[in-house]
UniProtKB/Swiss-Prot annotation:
Pfam families: PIG-L. Keywords: Hydrolase, Metal-binding, Zinc. Its EC number is 3.5.1.103. This is 1D-myo-inositol 2-acetamido-2-deoxy-alpha-D-glucopyranoside deacetylase 3. The lineage of its organism: Bacteria, Bacillati, Actinomycetota, Actinomycetes, Catenulisporales. GO terms for biological process: mycothiol biosynthetic process.
Length: 355
């Protein structure tokens, strides 16, 4: 069997960590579509590199905004509209996961265990089924069990503000950090009374935890591009910038200051995969919306995704940023990790081309 030249040029060190474990990335998101809009290009990049990418979604997004007329009709005709929307979004997520090459996807505690809490201040925040009203330790134990099973070196979630302040995003941040700590503990029962790491699961220490973030400079760029007209939430920012208000005097309620960004993943070659996954989330993504058009454009910046290191040690930097979430974790030379070509086909396809 003849290996393609680009594979032969790939250093064996990219196949595992320094202990010989296969590289694995776990993303913890709040609702279906979050995995795509915030980390889709990065997920597709690592999946294409044959790194195992896993996803835990905390809710089915039962209370998300509906932007597709057909989806709205389905919900309106259902006896329980929120339940119907949740079931629809489960199917949409399955399509997006396929487009991004994600190896394993699950819902925290199982689909429907915890519900979308709605936006901050809404009555649904106190619904006993909602994520933010649920038992925190039970949620931590469920995620810790997933961490011990998957054994990722890198976990990606949100920052302490949840990106834009959604209660479920903030909760996902909180329980992710707590679950990382819980998963690293050896033995004992969980604080919620069960087996915290899954029956028979060994403790696992996640090497690096990141928050997916959007720097203020990107938000300003998007605002200037979209202008103050239309339905974009950036209209007030665009108007302030157009009126000459100094940037440091404009309060931006979402995103992070640029100096907090520690990693920048250039995944523009996988923007098509991200866009395809966005199309799968039809109920949430109107194809004629400003957001979809901007995300799908090659110069919209959505193929470069940004992260803030919350736990762990940064690896080597490239122009001031980590260019790889596994920097400092990957095996450093051929002797650290034996290559495994078991995923390659035994026979070459007709024509002599492997792919």
């Amino acid at each position: 069997m003849t290996l393609p030249l680009d594979l032969l040029d790939m250093p064996f060190a990219r196949l595992g960590d320094r202990l010989g474990n296969p590289l694995r990335l776990l993303m913890v998101h709040a609702h279906p579509d979050d995995e795509t809009t915030t980390t889709g290009a990065t997920a597709a990049l690592y999946a294409a590199e044959t790194i195992d990418v896993y996803l835990v979604t905390c809710t089915r997004g039962e209370r998300g905004e509906i932007l597709d007329p057909e989806a709205q009709r389905v919900v309106d005709d259902a006896a329980d509209g929120e339940q119907a929307l949740g079931e629809l979004r489960v199917r949409e997520l399955a399509g997006a996961v396929t487009m991004l090459g994600i190896k394993g996807s699950r819902f925290l505690g199982g689909a429907g265990r915890w519900w979308d809490s709605g936006m901050a201040g809404e009555e649904s925040n106190t619904d006993p089924r909602s994520l933010v009203a649920g038992d925190f330790q039970e949620q931590v134990d469920a995620l810790a069990a997933a961490i011990r099973e998957i054994r990722p070196q890198v976990l990606v979630t949100y920052d302490s503000r949840g990106g834009y302040g959604h209660p479920d995003h903030i909760r996902a941040h909180q329980l992710s950090l707590a679950a990382v700590d819980r998963a690293a503990e050896t033995g004992g029962e969980s604080e919620s009374g069960g087996e915290g790491g899954g029956e028979g699961a060994e403790a696992w220490s996640v090497a690096k935890v990141y928050a997916a973030v959007v720097p203020f400079s990107i938000l300003r760029s998007v605002a200037r591009r979209l202008g103050s007209n239309g339905d974009s939430p950036f209209a007030p920012l665009a108007e302030a910038l157009a009126n000459g208000v100094p940037e440091d005097l404009i309060e931006i309620p979402y995103g992070v200051p640029d100096h907090l960004v520690t990693a920048q993943i250039d995944a523009r070659d996988w923007l098509d995969a991200k866009t395809a996954a966005m199309r799968s989330h039809r109920s949430q993504m109107a194809a004629d919306s400003w957001f979809f058009k901007l995300a799908a454009s090659s110069d919209g910046g959505f193929g470069i995704e940004h992260f803030q290191l919350l736990r762990g040690t940064a690896g080597p930097l490239d122009d001031g940023f980590e260019a790889d979430l596994f920097a400092g974790v990957r095996a450093v030379d051929d002797s650290d990790c034996e290559p495994d070509f078991g995923w390659l086909p035994e026979e070459e396809p007709a024509g002599g081309e492997l792919f």
